[in-house]
């Protein structure tokens, strides 16, 4: 029992050590589609949907666009519907 108490003390000393590297955490920005006055996600709005599609025509992941999971699912469905209705191309042509 003394051994487990001793290890917790040494772990506490290591955490409080000034020579230890500080870990930098970047604060994640909020979802751009959840703010007030945000545009409505709709398949009939290709100008909005094109912002969430890469140059090659692939849907960008939420870790790049900072969109929350709920809005990401709505975006994916809207992009798929817009592609089927020929409002968005499946593959963008190289220039």
Swiss-Prot record:
Name of one Pfam family that matches: Ribosomal_S18
Gene Ontology BP annotations: translation
Domain of life: Bacteria
Presence of the UniProt keyword Lyase in the record: no
SUPFAM superfamilies, per database record: Ribosomal protein S18 (SSF46911)
Keyword list, A-Z: Ribonucleoprotein, Ribosomal protein, RNA-binding, rRNA-binding
Gene Ontology cellular component list: cytosolic small ribosomal subunit
Gene3D superfamilies hit by this protein: Ribosomal protein S18
Keyword Ribonucleoprotein attributed: yes
Gene Ontology terms, MF aspect: small ribosomal subunit rRNA binding; structural constituent of ribosome
Record family assignment: Belongs to the bacterial ribosomal protein bS18 family.
Described function: Binds as a heterodimer with protein bS6 to the central domain of the 16S rRNA, where it helps stabilize the platform of the 30S subunit.
HAMAP family given in the database record: Ribosomal_bS18 (MF_00270)
Assembly: Part of the 30S ribosomal subunit. Forms a tight heterodimer with protein bS6.
Protein name: Small ribosomal subunit protein bS18
Organism encoding this protein: Rickettsia africae (strain ESF-5)
Lineage: Bacteria, Pseudomonadati, Pseudomonadota, Alphaproteobacteria, Rickettsiales
Gene, per the UniProt record: rpsR
């Amino acid at each position: 029992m003394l051994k487990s108490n001793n290890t917790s003390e040494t772990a506490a000393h290591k955490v409080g050590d000034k020579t230890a590297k500080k870990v930098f955490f970047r604060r994640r920005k909020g979802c751009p589609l959840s703010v007030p006055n945000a545009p409505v996600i709709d398949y009939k709005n290709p100008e909005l949907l094109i912002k969430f599609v890469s140059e090659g025509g692939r849907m960008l992941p939420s870790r790049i666009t900072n969109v929350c999971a709920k809005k990401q699912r709505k975006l994916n469905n809207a992009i798929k519907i817009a592609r089927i209705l020929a409002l968005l191309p499946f593959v963008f042509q190289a220039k």
